[in-house]
Amino acid sequence: MKDHDFDGDKGLAKGFLENFADANGRSKYMEILQEVSNRKIRAIQVDLDDLFNYKDESEEFLGRLTENTRRYVSIFSAAVDELLPEPTEAFPDDDHDILMTQRADDGTDNPDVSDPHQQIPSEIKRYYEVYFKAPSKGRPSTIREVKASHIGQLVRISGIVTRCSDVKPLMAVAVYTCEDCGHEIYQEVTSRVFMPLFKCPSSRCRLNSKAGNPILQLRASKFLKFQEAKMQELAEHVPKGHIPRSMTVHLRGELTRKVSPGDVVEFSGIFLPIPYTGFKALRAGLVADTYLEATSVTHFKKKYEEYEFQKDEEEQIARLAEDGDIYNKLSRSLAPEIYGHEDIKKALLLLLVGAPHRQLKDGMKIRGDVHICLMGDPGVAKSQLLKHIINVAPRGVYTTGKGSSGVGLTAAVMRDQVTNEMVLEGGALVLADMGICAIDEFDKMDESDRTAIHEVMEQQTVSIAKAGITTSLNARTAVLAAANPAWGRYDLRRTPAENINLPPALLSRFDLLWLILDRADMDSDLELAKHVLHVHQTEESPALGFEPLEPNILRAYISAARRLSPYVPAELEEYIATAYSSIRQEEAKSNTPHSYTTVRTLLSILRISAALARLRFSESVAQSDVDEALRLMQMSKISLYADDRQKAGLDAISDTYSIIRDEAARSKKTHVSYANALNWISRKGYSEAQLKECLEEYAALNVWQIDPHTFDIRFI
């Protein structure tokens, strides 16, 4: 079998890089090479989809490239060396430039030097790295599908990143200086382990019959950034009864720091064997471990701050922003298969959007994340809502209370396999940093484990002092918890405090504690049954009157909204302060208060109002935002207020009148607008139809007069 002509392949690579044009007719790769020459970028990513679509390229060349990828990385690098244009912009010289200039002055950069050890390797001259991105045709492989036949080939693998090491320097070219003859000696390093030179291989030392003394010159040597990551199979790819498999991924150069634990990603890379080292090598025999040398990383769900909008997405977001009913459309697009819970879905939408974080001049931080606890009877779709929110959020971690220890939620001290040092391994709350942590069965957690959440929910850090490590980790996460009442179902004969059975210190940290009670109601149960049957028959939700938004559009809209930092205007200060004090007064009057109101409640009102302003793409909070925030807080306990009214013997019409009268007296008004009256009674769970009935009944009694056009109220 004759040797393959790799020089011919280098010519093909040069032709592709030189002549390939994108859809706009621009020389894509020559523009990238110009930016590399100007030292603006270091990575040259060759997309094999471009190579597949290139008219002058044969399928055999693409096949050879994917089956012997490491060799073709060096072939493309050699082609880039020949094609690299002259820089068009000035840039300051770094240490590497100074060394290369000095070598040129000394004449040591001459490639015709007879001694191969004194020839400067091409690798040390390069400022760039060449990466291949695998063709996007077909679905990515799972870890289980990558076998021994794929060794040396370019593969695409999807999975979730479970851990990442620190970024360390990895030697690519070792440079020595001989103390006896003064020559520079170069040693290319192709693996993570190498044997340093102890004898000078130069011709002068050999002629003088001397061993020489090569001294390693670290500043002249070339190092690459190196990071090791562990990737695990996604849950949906694991067969029944099996445990998820994992794979080691090596990231070099510009690919480091691209992933973090918890990210769902797709790696393109070269599947390679690596021999065991140390004591493992004694027992391994002919068995080798495997790893993936990554050449590209693609995130399935981009972080909000990394989101780059496509033109069509920008147009769609602009159209949605102009829609007056966007708040309802976005909330109803969350889990449309789940019947009802409209207000809960609105609250969960606001949890996804959040409020801006505030940092005061003295360094004090005020959190912007909204925490929500869903507490209710079994079978009201709490867990389904949690899982759906985790799917929509770009970064989310789902865990259960009984299956999570305090260490599993915060951080554990472990020994790093790469460096053998004691390192911190982040728990669920740390993995969900800048995202959402959903904790199901919150009431089943041990009290000692639950205390780990207190610091995270307010200070948004995890403080650790164990195994000689004293540090603080960021956990800027929104906590979404689901719990059952103390006796499995809510017992109306007991007080809310007895039913909820969570400490006040924890309850006050939740912006919204939503009680979902499963009450028997003929009409509601009939509608629910029809909805569930429709979903089972058609595997899709019933018609909503509009097309529900896809999760990627939801993420794009929320990403655009999160870039705003709305402020509270001065004219709303009095209004918010009055609303907060009235909540405190109502709670003080009640024999069995339904909520635990502290100053944190005031901050919760501000956070929810700011999230609503973000949804409107507004730079300032409006009164309507504050009213909606207060309404959501009231609606979260609405089922309990209905019981209070029944116990007090009040009918809906009388109670509606009492609410309007008390609010008008508090604000010292004799003239009340219809919008204000509707807002006041909706906070208490009454409908617009009940308001109209109340207005007519009390107008007939001459208690007030109603404007025939605007329906505004004037007390007599």
From Swiss-Prot:
It catalyses: ATP + H2O = ADP + phosphate + H(+). InterPro entries: MCM, MCM7, MCM_CS, MCM_dom, MCM_lid, MCM_N, MCM_OB, NA-bd_OB-fold. A zinc finger (C4-type) spans 178-205. CDD domains: MCM7. Component of the minichromosome maintenance (MCM) complex, a heterotetramer composed of MCM2, MCM3, MCM4, MCM5, MCM6 and MCM7. Interacts with ETG1. Residues 326-531 form the MCM domain. This is DNA replication licensing factor MCM7. Induction: By both rootknot and cyst nematode infections. SUPFAM superfamilies: Nucleic acid-binding proteins, P-loop containing nucleoside triphosphate hydrolases.
